UniProtKB/Swiss-Prot annotation:
Disulfide bonds: none annotated. This is Flavonoid 8-O-methyltransferase 1. It comes from Ocimum basilicum (Sweet basil). GO terms for molecular function: O-methyltransferase activity; protein dimerization activity. PANTHER family: O-METHYLTRANSFERASE. It catalyses: an 8-hydroxyflavone + S-adenosyl-L-methionine = an 8-methoxyflavone + S-adenosyl-L-homocysteine + H(+); 4',7,8-trihydroxyflavone + S-adenosyl-L-methionine = 4',7-dihydroxy-8-methoxyflavone + S-adenosyl-L-homocysteine + H(+); 7,8-dihydroxyflavone + S-adenosyl-L-methionine = 7-hydroxy-8-methoxyflavone + S-adenosyl-L-homocysteine + H(+); 3',4',7,8-tetrahydroxyflavone + S-adenosyl-L-methionine = 3',4,7-trihydroxy-8-methoxyflavone + S-adenosyl-L-homocysteine + H(+). Pfam families: Dimerisation (PF08100), Methyltransf_2 (PF00891). Nevadensin is a selective inhibitor of human carboxylesterase 1 (hCE-1), a key enzyme responsible for the hydrolysis of a wide range of endogenous and xenobiotic esters. The keyword Glycoprotein does not apply. S-adenosyl-L-methionine binds at residue 223. The lineage of its organism: Eukaryota, Viridiplantae, Streptophyta, Embryophyta, Tracheophyta. GO terms for biological process: methylation.
């Protein structure tokens, strides 16, 4: 009977081999998704307004007809990955492809589209940083991206306008989703607040949704001067150029969406200390709160795919920035180190949670 170290039976040996093979080829899931959006397949099927056969899809892309079999094989794995479904209305009819909930989130005109984010994350230069991790462990560079490209993620973005536009569009689309959910599902978190600062809020997409839902609230979007330059506020929303490491405008609450996971523990503590100053110098003398939207690793029991996705995000933070995804214990450690006393967790954003932190 075949055997290997720690493997006692033929089936266990074959299972171990299959497990390794799966991980060797796992990048193909990401690449077939990238090909689908680059070829515009979700949009083509959507505009057709009914399921499309392989031949119809090949004509619409269009592709060299000699490569129709390759398209069929790509669609087969995308169906397996649940990005498309196959349907047949009549027994002798050719199978046709239709959209799923996942592929509807890849439509270019969908306000919540994940296509820009997918293309930014799967960028060839960005993905190249993963090949440098073993060498990176032996040097002083803060991230594999900086080791490979000799520039920070900000410099990488400044020198790659196409990538920067994709990433910013992806973040704006995500902000639409988060803003709409928070305005509907977590009203008690924002009720009673007169002022809120959205730190690193970019164009203010989330802040707009929140202040629109709470007309009595005044919102401030704090971001770097070049980010907010030219942005015009409204009656209850204004933009301020600044640096969260230096100061945060006084307010009843400070809002941080997907900010802290970009930074190391020490950097997060510095940011949170500035947030604490802002909420304790507000006219609300009792002290306000900090509202965080971020991932919490291992919080509550989750499906394997959700856990794996959170761990993937953690690796993305490690390879491109100095940040990390954190467990509840790791979050608590930086909260208390920054001078906060208590916190509450609301797991209402899928892989992410809302955390209220109190001084």
């Amino acid at each position: 009977m075949p055997s290997s170290s720690g493997v006692d039976s033929t089936q266990e040996l074959l299972d171990a081999q299959a497990h390794i093979w799966n991980h060797i080829f796992n990048h193909i899931n990401s690449m077939t998704l990238k090909w689908a959006v680059q070829l515009g397949i979700p949009d083509i099927i959507h505009k057709h307004d009914k399921p499309m056969t392989l031949s119809q899809l090949a004509d619409a892309i269009p592709i060299n007809r000699a490569k129709s079999d390759a398209l069929h094989r790509i669609m087969r794995i995308l169906v397996h990955s649940k990005f498309f479904d196959r349907v047949r209305t009549l027994p002798n009819e050719e199978e046709a492809y239709c959209l799923t909930r996942a592929s509807r989130l890849l439509l270019r005109d969908e306000p919540l589209s994940l296509t820009p984010f997918a293309l930014a994350v799967l960028d060839e230069d960005l993905m190249g940083t993963f090949h440098c991790v073993p060498e990176w462990f032996g040097n002083e560079c803060p991230s594999p991206l900086e080791f490979k490209h000799e520039k920070s993620i900000r410099e990488f973005a400044e020198n790659n306008q196409r990538w920067s536009l994709l990433f910013n569009e992806g973040m704006a689309n995500d902000a639409r989703l988060v803003g709409s959910i928070l305005a509907k599902e977590s009203r008690k978190v924002f009720e009673g607040l007169e002022t809120m600062v959205d730190v690193g809020g970019g164009t203010g997409m989330v802040s707009k949704a929140i202040v629109d839902a709470f007309p009595g609230m005044k919102g401030i979007v704090l971001d770097l001067p070049y980010v907010v330059s030219g942005l015009k506020g409204s009656g209850n929303l204004r933009y301020v150029g600044g640096d969260m490491f230096h100061s945060v405008p006084p307010a009843d609450a400070v809002f941080l969406k997907w900010i802290l996971h970009n930074w190391s523990d020490d950097e997060c503590i510095k940011i949170l200390e500035k947030c604490k100053e802002a909420i304790t110098t507000s006219k609300n003398m009792k002290g306000g709160k900090v509202i965080i939207v971020d991932m919490i690793l291992g919080y509550e029991k989750q499906q394997d795919e959700a856990v794996e996705t959170q761990l993937f995000f953690d690796m993305m933070m490690m390879t491109t920035l100095t940040g990390k995804e954190r467990t509840e214990q790791e979050w608590a450690k930086i909260f208390f180190a920054a001078g906060f006393k208590t916190y509450k967790i609301y797991p209402l954003l899928g892989l992410r949670s809302l955390i209220e932190v109190f001084p």
